[in-house]
């Protein structure tokens, strides 16, 4: 007993001694601060060398763009981690985004156990603890986040480590307010200068690689391809089922490319008939046709110097394909009704959900255009092939929906498990629609299994197609969810508890669905 107590005291004294030394050195670093970025990096070095806190990270919040950017990151072997300075978080996103949104410290005994852990840096040790604390600014509002990993997994030390980091965060926040905030605050927000962009240009916020959700091998590979292809003007063909996020990929490529400051213009090739396509893409001169009362630039001119995203390219006609091929080959075009040849410098990103090789074989798609577009193909996997991403996607989308609805939303683990049992024929778009519908139905703000409704009749979740009843042959797989519920109730003699057992659900779930699906219960 006495030996154990002495040992514990020694450890505590060692911790306090190291923390005092580290705090003293951090105070010296901050007192001599002249350059914010360099100063913050020095603070993280002290945390690593003197306080045994590895992978330190300091993020600062830009309230105008509503993003949390990495300002300093503990370097490995004195080398900057690739892409780390481009990674950003929104309030409520990931662990650091959660700390910013809540303004409270977050302590995890094992970082990988928390489903909010995004691991975008591919840096952290999954088995070690993780601590993130807010940098508090004026009026008790967070202006950033300090995060680090203790080098040892000693849970009894976590409270002391957290208090230490909170003290360091207070010192950092005070220095940042003195060095950075007065400059940006000198001008009222409403008077801040605005940079006018072309109307066709989409804001880059929300389209960086940091906003692509998914840690599956397939998504990691796609992110690597985007990083590589973004640097060049190579034509890209994005392929994937409807709802997989092809436009998001195109946006990410553009906004991470040297053309990011120019326009990103999108055009759906299936949205207009042939007689309007040419005018829409190439523009027209005044009087070129009835109703052409003025000259109008087409999408190619609007995208000059930037990127043109041609969605649903597989739906285009032979006539359209011929005109498109010419401009891809020569970089030249004329407006409808004009004779002046215009040169444009445009990067093309096309997208399709069709099997273009088969379309070429059938003569529906030009072979020469296919080879022009298919320089760098990117194939997006359907959501059913990356189920490990569903939980992260669900949390991401719930935060997005909560922001749009102006309220707090949460999703339960049970609801996540139910989502993972569904094969999502509509992919991410269907998942987002499902969660938005569930949020509307949830009065408490908790999205639980009870409020999740699927709308694809050919693809019921396993909870509605359990193996037991299916063996009896009573459940017709062609029925939609409402029809399945009625069939189960009829088989159970309209006893809700029995119907719930048949469907692998709880009686509460059955009762809720009866109400929202407007099923009339017979009087027994």
Curated annotation (Swiss-Prot):
Segments of this protein annotated with the region C-terminal DNA-binding domain: 482-524
Binding site for ATP: 240-247, 303-312
Entry annotated with the keyword NADP: no
SUPFAM superfamilies documented for this protein: GAF domain-like, Homeodomain-like, P-loop containing nucleoside triphosphate hydrolases
Keywords: Activator, ATP-binding, DNA-binding, Nitrogen fixation, Nucleotide-binding, Transcription, Transcription regulation, Two-component regulatory system
PROSITE patterns: SIGMA54_INTERACT_1, SIGMA54_INTERACT_2, SIGMA54_INTERACT_3, SIGMA54_INTERACT_4
Residue segments, region A domain: 1-182
Gene Ontology molecular function terms on file: ATP binding; ATP hydrolysis activity; DNA-binding transcription factor activity; sequence-specific DNA binding
Domain of life: Bacteria
Gene3D superfamilies: 1.10.8.60, 3.30.450.40, Homeodomain-like (1.10.10.60), P-loop containing nucleotide triphosphate hydrolases (3.40.50.300)
Keyword match DNA-binding: yes
Cystine bridges: none
Domain GAF: residue ranges: 35-176
Protein name: Nif-specific regulatory protein
Family matches, as PANTHER family: PTS-DEPENDENT DIHYDROXYACETONE KINASE OPERON REGULATORY PROTEIN-RELATED, TRANSCRIPTIONAL REGULATORY PROTEIN
């Amino acid at each position: 007993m006495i030996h154990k107590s002495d040992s514990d005291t020694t450890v505590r004294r060692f911790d306090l001694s190291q923390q005092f030394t580290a705090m003293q050195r951090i105070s010296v670093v901050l007192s001599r601060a002249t350059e914010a970025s360099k100063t913050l990096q020095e603070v993280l070095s002290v945390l690593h060398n003197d306080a045994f806190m590895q992978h330190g990270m300091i993020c600062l919040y830009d309230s105008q763009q509503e993003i949390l950017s990495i300002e300093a990151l503990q370097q490995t072997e004195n080398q900057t981690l690739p892409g780390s300075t481009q990674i950003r978080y929104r309030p409520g996103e990931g662990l650091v985004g959660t700390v910013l949104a809540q303004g409270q410290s977050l302590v995890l005994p094992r970082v990988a156990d928390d489903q909010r852990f995004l691991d975008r840096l591919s840096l952290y040790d999954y088995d070690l603890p993780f601590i993130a604390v807010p940098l508090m600014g004026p009026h008790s509002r967070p202006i950033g986040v300090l995060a680090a990993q203790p080098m040892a997994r000693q849970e009894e030390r976590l409270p002391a480590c957290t208090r230490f980091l909170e003290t360091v965060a207070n010192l950092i926040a005070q220095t940042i307010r003195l060095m950075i905030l007065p400059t940006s605050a000198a001008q009222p927000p409403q008077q801040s200068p605005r940079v006018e962009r072309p109307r066709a240009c989409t804001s880059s916020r929300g389209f960086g690689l940091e906003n692509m959700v998914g840690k599956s091998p397939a998504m990691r590979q796609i992110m690597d391809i985007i990083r590589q292809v973004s640097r060049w003007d190579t034509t890209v063909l994005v392929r994937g089922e409807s709802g997989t996020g092809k436009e998001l990929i195109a946006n990410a490529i553009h906004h991470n490319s040297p053309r990011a400051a120019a326009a990103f213009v999108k055009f759906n090739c299936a949205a207009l008939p042939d007689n309007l396509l040419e005018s829409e893409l190439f523009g027209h001169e005044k009087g070129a046709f009835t109703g052409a009362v003025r000259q109008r630039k087409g999408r190619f001119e609007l995208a000059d110097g930037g990127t043109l995203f041609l969605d649903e390219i597989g739906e285009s006609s032979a006539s359209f394909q011929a005109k498109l091929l010419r401009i891809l080959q020569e970089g030249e075009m004329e407006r409808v009704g004009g004779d002046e040849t215009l040169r444009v410098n445009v990067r093309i990103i096309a997208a399709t959900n069709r099997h273009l090789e088969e379309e070429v074989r059938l003569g529906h798609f030009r072979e020469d255009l296919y080879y022009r577009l298919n320089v760098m193909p990117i194939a997006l996997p359907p959501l059913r092939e990356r189920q490990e991403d569903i939980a992260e996607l669900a949390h991401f989308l719930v935060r997005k929906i909560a922001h749009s609805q102006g309220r707090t939303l949460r999703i339960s683990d049970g609801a996540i498990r139910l989502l993972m049992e569904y094969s999502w024929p509509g992919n991410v778009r269907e998942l987002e629609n499902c969660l938005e519908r569930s949020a509307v139905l949830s009065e408490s703000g908790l999205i639980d299994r009870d409020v999740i409704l699927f709308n694809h009749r050919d693809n019921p979740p396993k909870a509605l197609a359990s193996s037991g009843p299916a063996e009896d042959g009573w459940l017709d797989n062609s029925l939609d969810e409402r029809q399945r519920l009625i069939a189960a109730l009829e088989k159970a003699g309209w006893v809700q508890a029995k119907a719930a057992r048949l469907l692998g659900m709880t009686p509460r779930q059955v009762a809720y669905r009866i109400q929202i699906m407007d099923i009339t219960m017979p009087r027994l």
